[in-house]
Amino acid sequence: MRVALVHDWLTGTRGGEAVLAEIASFFPGAPIFTLFRKDGAVGAGLASHPIHTSALQRVTLGGRLYRPLLPLMPQAVAGFRLDGFDLIVSSSHCVAKGVIPPPGAVHVCYCHTPMRYAWDQRDDYLRQVTPLLRPLLRAELEHMRTWDVVSSARVDHFVANSRLVARRIERYWRREAEVIPPPVDVDFFTPGGERGGHVLMVAALVPYKRVEVGIAVAREVGLPLHVIGEGPMRRALRRGAPATVHFLGRVTREKLRDEFRSAALLLVPNVEDFGMVTVEALACGTPVVGLEGSGTADVVVSGEHGRLAPEGSVAALVAACREVLGREFPQGALRTRAEGFSRQRFRRRFGYLLERVLPARTSP
């Protein structure tokens, strides 16, 4: 059976790439089709797979400039030639699910979320451009919505990373999705060391992560805030932050683990699609404060593994943080919860899905 893997783009090693690497391990040597890649951004789990990029690779400056090319991405992903492949597995948060499978092939899409730019974060995307260009961009995003719905018919089986994303898939595309949470390396993220007295955020410095809300919450709680992550808002956030906020930028896995181990709590003030960092924190024995109705709620049982605030205001999040800080959360219980999202469990569930959806085939 010939298998092709499709991923939106390879410009970092975040949660989506971890999922892709785990899926790729089912199919050693299977080619990966991606719109563009950034040098040095392909992790060890994907290094043995041939990687094919689209024509956009030549105009993204090595994967550094790509968001303005959003209108060109549907055509680029549809241009991948997949003739002769029997199984297509796409890992999609933007356009990868819009690849055109050959006749007779089975297309399984692991959906991290439907395209943010066209749906739940459209208004945020519009605010990032000048008012003069907004009418043009709004019209283009409406076109992208139409394409997004139409191209969903190219998928035979959807897998969602959380109940929240499954609801979006049903609402936007009128399709059902099986929920299989992403794999987390709970063997690496383990408890250790002394618990410290700071709040931790692990997030890209972009508007929808609401880092400015996290800064306000930590100030009200009276604890230092450590922020791990990079992004275009770094300068603005640093300019308005008090001295008790420490921007650590991009860190090694070992440093990330140390931060989880020493934090008083992990704060997730935004609506996460799933949030692998939530599981990583619990695996290290650290409670989590997040939001009800978010993907975080698939991981955190409020009162057992932290607290889920009923809404995302500073006041509600401060109250949740104070409750968590005022009680003990046994590390064993947090660790046990995290182990339910292990790489091994993902492999069992995703492997079982493949067994169910693939027709019986004789080996070539």
Where are these regions (language model features)?
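Active-site donor-binding segments of glycosyltransferases and PAPS-dependent sulfotransferases
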Residues: 26-97
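Acidic donor-binding loop of glycosyltransferase active sites
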Residues: 261-273, 286
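Short hydrophobic beta-strand element within catalytic cores of glycosyltransferases
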Residues: 267, 287-292, 300
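Nucleotide-activated donor-binding/catalytic signature segment of Leloir-type glycosyltransferases, i.e.
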Residues: 235-257
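Conserved donor-binding/catalytic core segment of Leloir-type glycosyltransferases
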Residues: 186, 190-226
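A charged, aromatic-enriched C-terminal amphipathic alpha-helix characteristic of glycosyltransferases
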Residues: 312, 326-357
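Membrane-proximal helix-turn-helix segments that form the acceptor-binding/catalytic region
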Residues: 126-158, 166
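Conserved acidic donor-binding segment of nucleotide-sugar-dependent glycosyltransferases
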Residues: 301-303, 307-314, 323-328
